[in-house]
């Protein structure tokens, strides 16, 4: 089984550059605007899209992403509408990988089999489910793999050598290294330690390693890019969108343009870093 994620990372490896993985919240601040953001991301330089599934109790998310989820839910966003976004995106873009990211409760209520069927039909390539450990692979991970959808695991600085093989077992697509403990949007980790961690994980897997949590600026993204196969940016993009909204969460500026400007700057920085390192 070769997915769009596999194809994308193979292409990037051949080009000698890391991926820019961009996260935003589905339905934030509303369905129409969020879909415009999603369609604009690849044109701005995003290589992989992480599509957030808004949830009322997002335990791993910091204030910015929690607020984005709340705005989306208040605007009527549902899991079905988030899948609709993926399907609409696929009508114009059949190559950029889509990874849906969120919490298991949403999928469980929707129905695992129904969700996987609809996700595959909508053009979803991978899942990141932050509250589903490897001990529960039978719940979603293995069915997802059988459906042709990558299941992407999170590793952290506290994932020790005993735990790492369990985390990597049944992982596919890429490995998401959370560069610090805590919630999304925290301060960036020491890049030297990140590099050491990535090298350590690579001893146990051939999968690409993408690093996220705390990456906010093009300079930070470039620093991480020297050590990883991909850089994940989420909170900064969510904040760029939020900066164009009024106190009620309605657009007062141009959220799409704000997100696009940031992603373009991030993409230029990430690509230039690896090119300089390769010369």
From Swiss-Prot:
Residues annotated as catalytic: 50 (proton acceptor), 61 (proton acceptor)
Matching CDD domains: Tryptophan_synthase_alpha
Enzyme class: lyase
One GO CC annotation: cytosol
Highest taxon above the source species: Bacteria
UniProtKB keywords: Amino-acid biosynthesis, Aromatic amino acid biosynthesis, Lyase, Tryptophan biosynthesis
EC number(s) reported in the record: 4.2.1.20
Pfam families in UniProt: Trp_syntA (PF00290)
Catalysed conversion reaction: (1S,2R)-1-C-(indol-3-yl)glycerol 3-phosphate + L-serine = D-glyceraldehyde 3-phosphate + L-tryptophan + H2O
One function term, GO molecular function aspect: tryptophan synthase activity
Record family assignment: Belongs to the TrpA family.
Known function: The alpha subunit is responsible for the aldol cleavage of indoleglycerol phosphate to indole and glyceraldehyde 3-phosphate.
Assembly and interaction partners: Tetramer of two alpha and two beta chains.
Protein name (record): Tryptophan synthase alpha chain
Gene: trpA
């Amino acid at each position: 089984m070769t997915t769009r994620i596999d194809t994308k990372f193979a292409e990037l490896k051949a080009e000698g550059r890391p991926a820019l993985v961009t996260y935003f919240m589905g339905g934030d601040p509303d369905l129409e605007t969020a879909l415009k953001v999603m369609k604009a991301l690849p044109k701005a330089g995003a290589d992989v899209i992480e599509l957030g599934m808004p949830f009322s109790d997002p335990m791993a998310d910091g204030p910015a992403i929690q607020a984005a989820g709340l705005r989306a839910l208040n605007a009527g966003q549902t899991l079905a509408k988030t899948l609709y976004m993926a399907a609409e995106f696929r009508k114009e873009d059949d190559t950029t990988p889509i990874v849906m990211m969120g919490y298991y409760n949403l999928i469980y209520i929707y129905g695992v089999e129904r969700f996987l069927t609809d996700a595959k039909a909508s053009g979803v390539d991978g899942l990141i489910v932050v509250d589903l450990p490897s001990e529960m692979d039978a719940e979603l991970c293995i069915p997802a793999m059988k459906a042709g959808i990558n299941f992407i695991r999170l590793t952290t600085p506290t994932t020790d050598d005993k735990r790492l093989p369990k985390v990597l077992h049944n992982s596919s697509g890429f490995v998401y290294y959370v560069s610090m403990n805590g919630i999304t949007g925290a301060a960036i980790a020491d890049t030297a330690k990140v590099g050491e961690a990535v090298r350590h994980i690579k001893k146990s897997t051939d999968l690409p390693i993408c690093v996220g949590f705390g990456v906010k600026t093009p300079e930070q993204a470039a620093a991480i890019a020297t050590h990883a196969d991909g850089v994940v940016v989420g909170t900064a993009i969510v904040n760029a969108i939020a900066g164009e909204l009024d106190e009620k969460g309605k657009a007062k500026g141009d959220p799409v343009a704000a997100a696009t400007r940031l992603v373009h700057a991030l993409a230029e920085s990430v690509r230039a870093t690896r090119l300089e390192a390769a010369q």
